[in-house]
Each structure stands twice: as structure tokens, then as C-alpha cells.
Amino acid sequence: MRVPVAVDDLVAPSTMGERHTVIDRGTSVAAVHTALPPHRYAQSDLTELIADLCLEPGADRALLRRLHTSAGVRTRHLALPIEQYAGLGDFGQANAAWLTVGLALAEEALSGALDAAGLTAADIDLLVCTSITGVAAPSLDARLAVRMGMRADVKRVPVFGLGCVGGAAGLGRLHDYLLGHPDDTAVLLSVELCSLTLQRDGSLANLVAGALFGDGAAAVVARGGDAGRRGAGWPMVAATRGHLYPDTEHLLGWRIGASGFRVVVDAGIPDVVRTHLGGDLRNFLATHGLVPDDIGTWICHPGGPKVLAAVGDALELPDGALDSSWRSLAGVGNLSSASVLRVLEDVATRCRPDPGTWGVLLAMGPGFCAEFVLLRW
């Protein structure tokens, strides 16, 4: 039976004291669960590992240590025990580790989310799986569907290439699907094992990535209308919007070659964020009768200190607005597409926004692009 959306949930008081309908239908987040590998290390330990793997013997390690100190990261989780990274001789070995470890983490994340939502794997109608740190055919989602006992008719959408924007974009695509299939249950699964993509060279981009990125997985269960949300502390998804910025392909992504995935990360990313993000986000909110001051909760992908600072500047956010993102960056690093989902889980379970609070979930990724998701608790 279709569960109707409560219209009052999607009506907001304007800043002028009037009331108006922001949007007439939505979908609901039923649960989010993050899974992290058990191998957790201090940033200082990872500094020495990366120096050993990436720098020439006897090379000055001062720049690397400065990068790691300024990254805003205290600890990270790795897919493998730290001593095993020296033995990863080629892309084939790294990708095999991605498949083995990634599948186990995916099952842990999805099982946790389903349990929290009171559902089973057989209840899933749509499974969207995003990862940019490994490849497989059959895809990871196909293997997981069989392993967890999903129905034979489950719809599967494996996604590669979204990178850090994948958590926000994936949640947006669940929303789009559920608007047309309001009786269904849809799942987003993010699996990112960034440490397995580390190259054995001292290029600046490789060292920057080695200072920021960690490993982990996250799963989101979503349903049509407000089914499963009441009393659980999870928000409604009211609307989404993406922005693709022309002539920015060079800013972020991979160069793929014989050694695997070589990171591309340009110093111009914060400038693009400061130039475009504020106006684009304000236009998105205005479409739904809102302004930034109406937003009580900001859930931002923790891309790094410079990116978070640029987001705060672009949106003119008050001090503390991005505390959950900074906390996630410090605790686990940048988990690529899984990061913003971990922040969403933290906000919902630790911060517990009051009913009626508006939120914005946002992330940026290769393209260069941004994705906005409007939430209501």
C-alpha cells in the first residue's frame, strides 16, 4: 500500500513570517550505517608508511610531514594491515584486495542499515552501488546480492566515476527512483578503499591524497513517502539538484594506467567552490522557497581542510556549522563517496536535529560537479 506524504512535513515558514508549500512530495531515509576496516592507525604512523612507499631512500620527508600535519586528520582505517602494503606489487593485487575486503565491508554496512530499518535483503527493490577505487565484473553489487539473499529480480545499478560526489548523487538518485516507485525500498551502497590506489611515487598529488584519504563503506536504506521514518530520527528527502561545471575536467579524478588509478587533484578546487557554490546553492533553495538561514543542519562531504573552509566561505556559514564534517575528517579521513553518508549518520544519531529542521547534504566530485540534497527532519 502506498504511504502518503504528510504535506505539513514539507511546508516551511518563510523568513517573512508567511507559510508556503516548498514541495508536495518526498521520500524517506530509513537508516544509514557505516562500516570501517578494523585496521586503525594514527596519522603519524601513516606518514612513515607513505614515506617508505613513495619517496626515494634518503629523500627529505619534511614536505610529506607538513602535508600530513596540516590535513586535519588524526586517525584513519586501512583495508589491510599496514605491513601488507609493501607487498602490493601491481594493480592486479591491489584490485583483488579491493574486491575481497570491499565485499566484506559492503555486507557489514548493508546488514547494519537493514537491521536498523527493520528490513531484510529480500525487501530490496533497487540496489545502487558506487565505488571509484576498484573494478569487477561481475560487479560488487551482483556478488553481494547473491551472498546476502536478495531477490532474483532486484534492480542493480553499479556506478563508477562519481568519486567523492557519489554519496550525495546516489542519495539523489534513490529519491528520483522512489518518486516513481513509492512502494519500493531502495538502497545506496558506497565502498571506497582509497589506500589501495596509492601510487609508488613522490608526486605532489599522490602525497596529498596519501595524507587525506581513508577506507570505509556506507549504506543508506530509503523508502517512498515517509514510510519507516517516524520516530527513528532520519530525515525526509525533499528535493535534489546537481551542477556540472564546464571546462573543469582537469581538476579532479583519475589517470588510469598500468599501475592502476593515479590521482588527479588540482589546487584550484577551493577557488571553484568559492566562485560557484554559494550562488548555485542559494538558487536551489530559492526554488523551494528557502534561504540559507532556514537551514538548521549542514551535511558536507569532508574533502579536506581547504575544501571545507571554501564551503564555509561560499555559503557564509556560522562557526560550528560544519563541525560534523570536520569531526569525520579528523577521525577517519576522506572516505570519498562514503564520507558524506558517514556525516549524515553522525548528524542523525549524535546531533539529533529537532523535528521540522531543514538540512542540506552536499558534496563535490570529478567533473567538476556538485550535488545538493534538501532534507527535512
Curated annotation (Swiss-Prot):
Biological process (GO) annotations held by this record are: melanin biosynthetic process; polyketide biosynthetic process
Q: Which gene encodes it?
A: rppA
Catalytic center residues: 164
Natural source organism: Streptomyces peucetius subsp. caesius
Disulfide cysteine pairs (residue numbers): none
Q: What does this protein do?
A: Involved in the biosynthesis of melanin but also various secondary metabolites containing a naphthoquinone ring. Catalyzes the iterative condensation of five CoA-linked malonyl units to form a pentaketide intermediate. THNS subsequently catalyzes the dual intramolecular Claisen and aldol condensations of this linear intermediate to produce the fused ring of 1,3,6,8-tetrahydroxynaphthalene (THN).
Q: Which reaction does it catalyse?
A: 5 malonyl-CoA + 5 H(+) = naphthalene-1,3,6,8-tetrol + 5 CO2 + 5 CoA + H2O
Q: Family assignment?
A: Belongs to the thiolase-like superfamily. Chalcone/stilbene synthases family.
**PANTHER family in the cross-refs:** 1,3,6,8-TETRAHYDROXYNAPHTHALENE SYNTHASE (PTHR11877:SF99), HYDROXYMETHYLGLUTARYL-COA SYNTHASE (PTHR11877)
UniProt-recorded Gene Ontology molecular function terms: acyltransferase activity, transferring groups other than amino-acyl groups
Give the matching CDD domains: CHS_like
Full protein name:
1,3,6,8-tetrahydroxynaphthalene synthase
Task: Tell me the Pfam families matching this sequence.
Answer: Chal_sti_synt_C, Chal_sti_synt_N
Domain of life where this protein originates: Bacteria
Q: Which InterPro entries match?
A: Chalcone/stilbene_synt_C (IPR012328), Chalcone/stilbene_synt_N (IPR001099), Polyketide_synthase_type-III (IPR011141), Thiolase-like (IPR016039)
According to its UniProt record, in which pathway does this protein act? Pigment biosynthesis; melanin biosynthesis
Q: What UniProt keywords apply to this chain's record, in alphabetical order?
A: Acyltransferase, Melanin biosynthesis, Transferase
Q: How does it assemble?
A: Homodimer.
- Please state the Enzyme Commission number of this protein: 2.3.1.233
